A protein has these predicted regions:
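Class I SAM-dependent methyltransferase Rossmann-like catalytic core
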Residues: 2-45, 65-66
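Short amphipathic alpha-helix with an adjacent loop that forms part of the alpha/beta core around
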Residues: 142-154, 177
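Conserved beta-strand signature within the Rossmann-like core of class I S-adenosyl-L-methionine
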Residues: 184-196
């Protein structure tokens, strides 16, 4: 993961705490990803391709602690090694992780530093085999990489594209659409510096041309920027909400979840958007977000459906600042808030389907508009069961009484005697 101002010419580049949050999300997600995919005892091989489109030099120095910090290439490689050990610890039938990694970096100092760091850390023998180094723009290499993934894994094309661009212009949405259209098993983790875009957004011709080139010109539903600024109290959040919805629509993913990361300067939000074609992948990433988040933003305004987003703000990181915030655990507060919101939304959705729907269908059809994980969904449903607003039953008719009992195939439906409060 690299930004243009990082400098590897004299050693590891300097990295700030808010950027390390991206590394933490990636590390935690890869660990869960391998556990999820490698759980079948009958598997022999797990094929996967990891693509780091903006790899950087692989090593950083923390701006505050001065400690050495590993970048995304080594996070990927370490995740593979650790997963292979963990997955085979209690297996009778060995599982081989057949993972290829593509590390693309256009800047010469960063590329040379990464190549040297890989050799110094014992990965030299894999370069040209499982590790593919490319000194190039990601956009120029993407077609060849997509073809190589499809050749290795024709049916699913299982892969994760880590696209930590600087700014918002280096990854065309048309390219992301092609990834999903060509590789059904692909996932994309995209960095999008929304505040950098907001700095320049206006009603001028230059901005409108830029939005058109980014395929974001429909984000504001025909309203001008001047009109939005005059009529919306939180106009920045209102504009971000429109941009996010347009971004998701243009990328072509069925399932997605955003995570914001805030720089210490106040604004400076950028998004880490995970996109996939399967709701299970989305849920795994959401679980990671709930592990790492320490802040919450309500996006939206008049004329837009409200949605919420978890995120990371270094000012709220007790480990980073060395102070504990007594009496306040954000995770518990945000979790309770999400359960309350779901309890308000679920009844009308469920009552509109008199025959009910499966839990899996409920989650898959609504999860994109909520920061909640499947576990939080289950907790909200059980709260409604206890209040006799709904009922959850298994395929054989067993009534579910606790969140841990709910399975994807269970039917969520109105009770035989409906509440008069639902209209």
């Amino acid at each position: 993961m690299t930004e243009h101002h990082y400098d590897w010419s004299g050693g590891p580049a300097v990295i700030k705490q808010h950027s390390i949050a991206k590394h933490n999300v990636l590390r935690a997600y890869l660990a869960r990803y391998f556990i999820t995919l490698g759980c079948s005892p009958n598997q022999d091989v797990l094929k996967l391709t990891l693509v780091d489109g903006f790899a950087g030099g692989g090593e950083y120095t923390h701006s505050d602690t001065k400690q050495l910090v590993l970048g995304s290439p080594f996070i990927c490689l370490d995740a593979v090694r650790e997963a292979e050990f963990a997955l085979n610890a209690n297996r009778h039938k060995p599982l081989k992780l057949d993972v290829h990694c593509y590390f693309i970096e256009k800047e010469r100092p960063a590329f040379l530093y990464l190549e040297r760091a890989l050799r110094d850390r014992g990965y030299g023998h894999q370069i040209g085999a499982e590790i593919h180094l490319r000194r190039a723009n990601f956009h120029d290499e993407a077609e060849n990489i997509i073809d190589a993934i499809r050749a290795r894994n024709p049916r699913a094309g299982r892969s994760i594209f880590i696209l930590d661009q600087y700014g918002y212009k280096n990854v065309p949405f048309s390219l992301i659409r092609k990834i999903f259209a060509t590789l059904p098993g692909a996932e994309v983790v995209l960095t999008f510096n929304v505040d950098s875009l907001l700095t320049y957004v206006s009603d001028g011709d230059v901005t409108q041309e830029m939005l058109s080139n980014l395929e974001l010109n429909g984000a504001f539903c025909g309203r001008t920027i001047e009109e939005i600024k005059k009529s919306e109290r939180d106009w920045r959040l209102f504009i971000q909400s429109g941009l996010y919805r347009e971004l998701i629509q243009r990328c072509g993913a069925k399932h997605y979840t955003p995570f914001f990361i805030r720089s210490p300067q106040g604004h400076g939000d950028y998004w880490l958007v995970h996109m996939s074609q399967h709701h299970r992948a989305r849920d795994v990433m959401t679980e990671v977000h709930w592990e790492i988040q320490n802040h919450f933003i309500h996006y939206g305004g008049s004329g837009l459906e409200m949605f919420e987003i978890t995120g990371y703000d270094p000012d709220y990181d007790s480990l980073a600042i060395g102070q504990h915030r007594l009496g306040f655990e954000f995770d518990d507060v945000a979790r309770k808030q999400s359960i309350r919101t779901l309890k308000e939304q679920f009844p009308r959705y469920i009552y509109a389907r008199p025959d009910g729907l499966s839990f899996g269908e409920l989650f898959a059809s609504t999860c994109n508009g909520s920061p909640a994980s499947a576990e939080i969904y289950r907790s909200a449903l059980i709260a409604l069961v206890e209040e006799r607003v709904i009922e959850v039953v298994s395929e054989d008719g067993a009534v579910r009484r606790s969140a841990s009992q709910i399975r994807n195939t269970d039917c969520v439906r109105p009770p035989a005697q409906r509440s008069l409060l639902i209209t």
